[in-house]
Amino acid sequence: HSNGQVTAIDANYAKQLKVTGLSSLDAALRQTTIRTALPDTENEAMTMMTLKKGQTTADVYAKYSDEFISKFPTSAFGYKEKAAYLTDKAEYDAAAKLMEEGIKKSAAKDEAHSNYADLIYQKIIYKGDSVYKDWTLDKAIAEAQKAYEIKAQPIYRHQEAQINFVKGEYQKAYDTFMDLTNTSLLSGELYFEAAQAKKNLKAPAKEIEVLLDSAVSVGNKTGMVANYYLARGEFLKEQGEFRRAIQDYNMYDSIARPVSPAFFYTRYQCETKLRMWQPALLDIARTCYLAPKEPTYFAEWASLDLRVKRYDEGISAATHCIELAPEYADGYLLLGLLQKEKGNKEEAIKNLKKAQELGDSRAGEYLKKVK
């Protein structure tokens, strides 16, 4: 209404605003604050709901769920989405009733049972099972089994295996994961999950490694492999196989984006074990760059600089560590040791004393050496 005139919406403009599943991405529609109607075909409506999920508030999304249920009452999708909203609000009775209604009305009964299993499983993982006693892992398993009885899809057996894993039934979960590698569901993920089950069964390291090798091998064929290189690298690191771990970490680094500071820190730890100082310096620098407020990383950087006699760089890292955490003894201890190496005796004593005051038992021994 820029010039104070009220204008009627142009009829052609209204026609152009015809809703399709991808209209969520349309800038013109996003600028109108009115909640757009769902498309008239189920698939397009599901697409739009999926896109809307990250763009709207939970309450607005719940209204879409209601609209979806009224437009497509025989689709299992709407009931699941609305019940998830109710679960988040701790309205468990209402969520349970809605899922039961969905099972009665849905054309694809297998999907409805599987959705119910998933809702219970997610709720227990994130909120525990003490709240709302009717929802147990056993009930989730029963729902997944009903889905499989109606339609023998391997995905429903996979769901049951994942619930068994959370329940602590590791052998049962392992057996199913391995069975499923002979189905259309074959993926690196199945071998990775089987490896996790074996780990919890305290199996020999070699058995776990063979499963992780399979996860990498299958993952390479399907193009979904980064996380399996990372998982195998972490496993090899735990086994003290640092050189092989680094090879896997390097593969992960070459294909995964974005990479977290924790990753670079883990690889740095392996590199220092092998005295690979140059790559270790690069990785601890990357770690600190990506996590500029984490004092322990700067302490590690200062510590490595001390080891490789880069005293000025080390003093800079230790000083930054102290700025971030004035009560963290390691920063003062490292700064003192670096200053001692630089011949700055007075400052070294001052910082080592500060580390001692903050409870570092090593500082006293170093102080004797400076004096």
Language model regions located:
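Terminal, low-structured helical/coil segments at or just beyond the last alpha-helical repeat
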Residues: L337, E341-K371
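Short coil turns that delineate tetratricopeptide repeat
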Residues: P73, A107, K151-A152, L185-L186, ...
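TPR alpha-solenoid repeat register
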Residues: D26-A27, E44, G78, A112, ...
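Single-residue signature of alpha-solenoid repeat helices
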Residues: I9, Y61, A95, A140, ...
